């Protein structure tokens, strides 16, 4: 017993320590496909069991009706000037049920699926970030979701109908000056007391900031730490922990109403404070029984919320950017040709289209998991980080291609609000730096690993003998599986994954990708196992965690892209998009794994690189064998060994996945610089106005006409080259001459003239008159002295 107790104690020291709040976070959510990727032997049936569900007729009608109407009403430039949505927009949001998208119908909500919820946010975000955030927040982590999941029946009956119809405007107060990314350390306190009337309640003090909808909220969902020094709740615990309660705005002691200006986007966001605020004990969401259970509630809800809101907003930005930039690059001319023909434009166009496909595929797949009842904590973190980073990349590419058109603010600029929204998306719901460095692999290595959590649970048994027996059993399975994955990683690394398995029934042209994912999954599991000896230091070695998280994330993104391609019918015309998306993700995963092992703080783990990337190991072993054979006078063996050594050096490739090449880039860029079904599908779900008064409507008209006019322009150009007509004349005269000389018809000339008009309208930017200063305020210029004449 003494020896076993000592062993258990020693092993515990090596395992990563987990705080109470971390345990609650790890216990929240579910493990699904993320666990398969961590296992080293992913069962693809567990991914393909999710169908790509379509919206119901009611959900589609809501998108085509109220959402379309709201998009037409909101105008970013007017919103910027008035610092708010127009009254008509607020009226629609409340009356049409935008604030209760997933609240059940029996409580007055829409009862929509998560897929529909995401579709609503995505379409709104493509039109107005302010409108999208205004709708997003009441439907995400906050009072409605928490009451629906954990509230008492009385809370549901009273609040959910009022939240659904907009009678109550909610906000959720978690972040404060001293608790940002480390939200679990919130200093805000509530004490269980009895007031002067003898009523049991909580006296609260808090200081919060960055609270969206806070300035106009009527109901605050408040996160705080609850204390019960007099044991009035009878739980026998003084520090109960993080709790969530409902605080009406008009409660005495609440200070609320001031606004922040997040990147000057005018959605309502601001600070609030509470000084000796008293609320009844029944204000706790879920009642007194849920006192101290707030962190688990928040983590459970966040596992779903992070799958919906920001991924939808980010994908909207990606789709809109691809839609508008592909067409603008075709319409805009420089150096006598469409700028879409330049390779310098082609490269970012391909990146935009490929990343848009990758992002939307991950969004769609994860939504199916949520609608199937899962709470995908790790996938939601992956989406939060990688889709907002994808938004950053794509919008920046769009800005580069649009140039001054995107820089000059005004009613004609469709990108300025998207660009301003990037740092907000990057920062909220878990800052991206923290998400990448701490959460994706930091939590995934424990909760999604097939054995780590079981080993920790075994060690927690208070009986050392039982703890030892449980741990030994799990460890044996862990080591056995780890050994199998090590062999698989080595064999697949040496053979180019030729003998790796691919699921049956998938497009044959994509089977190589499944094999690579299987190989990298085994290698990832091996590297994860080899990182566990870091124990508690794993949290401090953030660069290890970040790189391993990149491997994990890109395997998830690649696999969901393949899922989306198959569920979308494996259409031949979309093959270039899935090729680009998967090649991009696998190359990043492989590079991240190489970097993680190359820079690993443990020497033994660095040696794992020679198993995962075995070229040096195998060529070295063959060379040694050849030398030994030569030494013992076995010339035939020596010759064969030499041939094998050279062959291994030539044919074994450590990095089996390359980034998309120029040819594929060209094909992918074509998907958005040419009209057609692929472009329509890729950008489906965003607001696409058809009115010429709208910048996007005008651009789309010009884009489609440009396809008709380009052959006519070529005829005119060739006529000038052949001397049929002179190009040294005004544009109008040139077109007249082309008609007169039968180069083009009069009807065709009318199209060319219309194209010139539309192109001019598209490339124009806004300009504003400068207000004339009062006479006494006019600057006084001092004329420069004339130069002296020698």
Annotate each predicted stretch with a short phrase.
Residues 252-278:
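Flexible, small-/acidic-enriched active-site or ligand-binding loops
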Residues 273-306, 323-340, 487-509, 520-539:
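A glycine-rich, basic-preceded beta-loop-alpha segment at the flavin cofactor/substrate interface
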Residues 1-138, 145, 149-169, 181, ...:
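Amphipathic, small/basic residue-rich leader segments at the start of a protein or domain
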Residues 374-406, 576-589:
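Charged, glycine-rich active-site and insertion segments that engage polyanionic ligands
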Residues 477-790:
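C-terminal amphipathic alpha-helical interaction region
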Residues 344-371, 396-399, 555-564:
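Loop-to-helix element that buttresses phosphate recognition and phosphoryl-transfer chemistry
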Residues 392-419, 596-609:
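A glycine-biased, small/acidic residue-tolerant capping/turn segment at secondary-structure junctions
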Residues 199-255:
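A short core secondary-structure module
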């Amino acid at each position: 017993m003494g020896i076993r107790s000592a062993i258990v104690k020693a092993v515990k020291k090596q395992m990563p320590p987990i705080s109470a709040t971390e345990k609650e976070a790890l216990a929240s959510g579910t493990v699904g496909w993320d666990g398969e990727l961590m296992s080293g032997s992913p069962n693809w049936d567990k991914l393909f069991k999710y169908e790509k569900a379509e919206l119901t007729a009611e959900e589609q009608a809501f998108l085509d009706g109220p959402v379309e109407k709201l998009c037409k009403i909101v105008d970013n430039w007017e919103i910027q000037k008035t610092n708010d949505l127009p009254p008509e927009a607020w009226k629609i949001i409340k009356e049409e049920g935008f604030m209760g998208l997933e609240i059940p119908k029996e409580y007055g909500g829409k009862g929509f699926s998560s897929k529909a919820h995401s579709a609503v946010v995505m379409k709104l975000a493509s039109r107005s970030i302010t409108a999208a955030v205004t709708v997003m927040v009441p439907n995400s982590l906050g009072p409605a979701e928490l009451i629906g999941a954990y509230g008492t029946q009385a809370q549901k009956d009273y609040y959910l109908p009022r939240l659904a119809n907009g009678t109550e405007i909610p906000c959720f107060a978690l972040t404060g000056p001293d608790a940002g990314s480390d939200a679990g350390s919130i200093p805000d306190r509530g004490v269980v007391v009895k007031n002067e009337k003898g009523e049991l309640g909580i006296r609260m003090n808090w200081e919060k900031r960055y609270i969206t909808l806070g300035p106009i909220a009527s109901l605050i969902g408040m996160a705080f730490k609850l204390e019960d020094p007099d044991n009035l709740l009878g739980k026998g615990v003084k520090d109960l922990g993080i709790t969530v309660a409902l605080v009406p705005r008009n409660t005495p002691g609440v200070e609320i109403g001031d606004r922040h200006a997040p990147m000057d986007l005018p959605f309502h966001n601001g600070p609030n404070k509470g000084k000796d605020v008293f609320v009844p004990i029944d204000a706790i969401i879920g009642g007194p029984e849920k006192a101290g259970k707030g962190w688990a509630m928040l983590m459970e809800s966040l596992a779903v919320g992070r799958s919906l809101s920001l991924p939808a907003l980010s994908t909207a930005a990606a789709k809109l950017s691809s839609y508008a930039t592909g067409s603008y690059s075709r319409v805009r001319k420089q150096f006598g040709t469409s700028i879409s023909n330049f390779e310098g434009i082609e490269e970012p166009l391909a990146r935009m289209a490929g990343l848009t496909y990758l992002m939307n595929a991950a969004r769609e797949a994860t939504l199916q998991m949520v609608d199937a009842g899962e709470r995908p904590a790790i996938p939601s973190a992956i989406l939060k980080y990688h889709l907002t980073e994808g938004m950053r990349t794509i919008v920046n590419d769009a800005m580069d291609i649009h140039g001054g058109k995107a820089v000059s603010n005004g009613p004609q600029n469709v990108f300025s609000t998207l660009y301003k929204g990037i740092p907000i998306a990057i920062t909220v719901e878990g800052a991206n730096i923290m998400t990448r460095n701490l959460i994706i692999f930091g939590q995934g290595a424990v909760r999604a690993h097939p054995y780590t959590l079981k080993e920790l649970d075994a060690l927690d048994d208070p009986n050392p003998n039982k703890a030892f027996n449980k741990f030994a059993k799990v460890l044996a399975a862990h080591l056995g599986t780890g050994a199998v994955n090590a062999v698989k990683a080595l064999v697949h690394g040496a053979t180019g994954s030729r003998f790796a398995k691919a699921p049956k029934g998938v497009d044959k042209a994509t089977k190589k990708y499944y094999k690579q994912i299987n190989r990298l999954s085994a290698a990832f599991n091996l590297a994860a196992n080899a990182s566990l000896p870091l124990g508690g230091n794993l949290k401090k070695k953030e660069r290890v965690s970040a790189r391993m998280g990149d491997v994990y994330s890109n395997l998830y993104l690649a696999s969901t892209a393949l899922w989306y391609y198959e569920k979308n019918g494996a259409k031949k015309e979309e093959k270039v998009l899935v090729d680009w998306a998967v090649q991009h993700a696998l190359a990043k995963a492989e590079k991240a794994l190489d970097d993680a092992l190359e820079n690993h703080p443990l020497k033994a783990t660095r040696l794992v690189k020679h198993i995962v990337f075995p070229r040096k190991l195998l060529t070295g072993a063959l060379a040694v064998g050849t030398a030994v054979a030569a030494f013992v006078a076995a010339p035939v063996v020596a010759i064969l060994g030499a041939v094998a050594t050279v062959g291994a050096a030539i044919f074994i490739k450590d990095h089996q996945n390359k980034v998309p090449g120029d040819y594929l880039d060209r094909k992918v860029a074509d998907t958005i610089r040419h009209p057609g079904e692929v472009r329509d599908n890729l950008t489906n779900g965003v607001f696409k106005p058809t009115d010429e008064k709208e910048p996007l409507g005008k651009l789309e008209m010009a884009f489609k006409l440009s396809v008709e006019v380009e052959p006519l322009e070529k005829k005119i150009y060739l006529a000038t080259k052949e001397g049929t007509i002179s190009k040294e004349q005004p544009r109008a005269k040139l077109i007249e001459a082309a008609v007169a000389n039968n180069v083009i018809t009069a009807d065709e000339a009318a199209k060319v003239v219309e194209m010139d008009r539309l192109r001019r309208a598209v490339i124009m930017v806004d300009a504003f008159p400068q207000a004339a200063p009062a006479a006494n305020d006019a600057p006084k210029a001092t004329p420069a002295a004339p130069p002296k004449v020698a």
